[in-house]
Structure formats: C-alpha cells, structure tokens
Amino acid sequence: MYKIAFDVMGSDLGSLTAIKAASEFIKEHNDLYLILVGDETEIKTALEQNPIDKNKYEILPTTQVIDMNGSILDIRRKKDASIIRTLELVRDQKVDGMLTAGNSAAFIGAAHFILGELNNIVRAGFMPTMPNAKNKLTLLLDVGANSENTPEDLINYAKMANIYYTEVLKNPNATVGLLNIGTEKSKGLELQKQTFKQLEKLKNINFVGNVESRDVLTGNVDIIVTDGYSGNICLKACEGAAKVLLTEIKKEITSSFIRKLAALVLKKSFKNVAAKFDYKNHAGAILLGVKGICFKSHGSSDVRSFKATLRMTLDAIKNNIVEKIEKGLIKNEY
C-alpha cells in the first residue's frame, strides 16, 4: 500500500476541491492510502459530500495555514501549518510522498529545512511534465524554485531529470537542451555559456545544444534545463498561449451554424488536441533534489489538476525516484 500525505489547505479553491479530487482519485487506485492534512472540521465537512472508504485514509488535524499571502518567515512562525506537518510526515518516513497547492516560497523553504537536499545538490528545482506535439512529455526545470542559479545547479538538473526520464517516463535515451535566446553556442549570458561548456563534457548526458522557447512544445528535445527565473516565464507563457489558442479555436468553430456543423466532424480531433495541451492535465511539478518525493500543484488547482498531481506523485513513488536519483548521482550512471 502506497501512502501519500495531501495538504488540502492553502489553495485558491479551498479544501472542498482538494477532498473531491482525493475522493475520486482513490476510488481508481486500490493500492493507495491518503493522509489528509489540514483543518479537521473543514475536512470532515468536505468528506460528507465526497466520501472516502474509512480504511483508505486518515486525518492529520492542523490549526494553521500558510496561504498565498503568507511569507517564507511563516515556516518559523506557524509550526502547526498544514504544509509543515505534511513535509514532516515525509521526513519521518510515515508516507512515501506528499503534495500541496500552498504557498510556493513556504513550500520550498520548509522542504529545505525539514528534508534537506540530496548530496551535492545546493538548490532543488521545480520540474513539471509538459505535453508536446510528438505525444510525449517534455521535462522543464527549474521553473521557479529559484530566482538565481549557477551552472552547477543546471548540470545537476540535467542529471536528475535524465534519471527521472529513464525511470519514470521509461525512456533511457532522452535528449537534453539548454534554454537560451538562440541556438548558437555563443548565445546567452555567462550562466548559459558556462553551463553549455559543462554539459558538452558530460558523457552520460545526450546534450543537443541550446533550445529556444518556441521549441519547448515541439517535442524535439526531451529535457530542457534553465534557471528558475527564465523557466517560470517560459512555463507560464506556454500555458497561457495554449489556453488562448484553444479558446480562440472554440470561439471560431462556434461562430456560425456552418462552422458548428463542420466542427461536429472534427469534434474528436479537437477534443484530443485540447486534452493534450490543457495544462490542468499536467498541473503538478516535483521539487527535484530534496530528500523526499514532494509535489506542488497550481495554487488555482481544480479537481482535474489535483488528480493529475496525485497521479504524478504516485508514479514517482512507484518508481522509487528519489533513491534512484541519489544512487545515480553518486555512481554517475545516467
């Protein structure tokens, strides 16, 4: 039985949405047990509307929340915050992994102090899985865990993501690119130039050079490494572009009776494309580099987003990804 700690507090839509997602997800997975962390009264009220088998969950009651307006200093001030208690369950090995949609800065800071980083990892990075045109997934990191990074950080991201792609996504021949403003070797700031030189030297990394942001969704590169500031801008630009494009397509095909008839013929194709590039189906990001399986979902997560993050968390647990990353970094096998 796999155990996941779910911080149900702190998201924009509240605990009811998180509990509804948990209720639906656990019915699809007989090998899963959840620890629901948060305000006990809220959780019990939500469970009345979205029941879960009593043998498949327990509640860890907390009295505090670090919401989106909170500060990283709250990780010291609010010892009984749900996000703190959830991470402590991972540290104490009472669960196999955790997820939250709470305050990102508090999550990153608390993970650093409570769990710590793997050997030789200075800064953990957020890594989502992004859909692409080749019906595969692209890994992009860091997408916002850090505002500044060093070449050593990006090298470690490439190594860890390569292990993740091999073990979780089952592709041992992943290509790795460096996000930059051009494909030429000389492009970029000193960070990109130094990182490029070091990536070229790695024998176990299939480095293909610089990648521009317009190529992120093409699927031509499996793993794209970048600093957290640039990565966050890139991620949100991709999500926003996909959302606007799908909205505009829907608007156009429903603007007249003739177009609506034509759309009926292509309905399945439109649905497939919409599902592929809907970020809610890929809403989670693992905090790669800490001593535990820790996922962050969007603060605006709805039921579908939470279920996607639960699925990603469970996949990482089943593939024992943190232990494999730790061993891979030590042995330099990937």
From Swiss-Prot:
SUPFAM superfamilies: Isocitrate/Isopropylmalate dehydrogenase-like (SSF53659). It comes from Mycoplasma capricolum subsp. capricolum (strain California kid / ATCC 27343 / NCTC 10154). It catalyses: a fatty acyl-[ACP] + phosphate = an acyl phosphate + holo-[ACP]. Its EC number is 2.3.1.274. It is an enzyme of class 2 (transferase). Belongs to the PlsX family. This is Phosphate acyltransferase. Pathway: Lipid metabolism; phospholipid metabolism. It is found in: Cytoplasm. Catalyzes the reversible formation of acyl-phosphate (acyl-PO(4)) from acyl-[acyl-carrier-protein] (acyl-ACP). This enzyme utilizes acyl-ACP as fatty acyl donor, but not acyl-CoA. GO terms for biological process: fatty acid biosynthetic process; phospholipid biosynthetic process. Keywords: Cytoplasm, Lipid biosynthesis, Lipid metabolism, Phospholipid biosynthesis, Phospholipid metabolism, Transferase. Gene3D superfamilies: Isopropylmalate Dehydrogenase. Homodimer. Probably interacts with PlsY. The keyword Metal-binding does not apply. It comes from the Bacteria. GO terms for cellular component: cytoplasm.
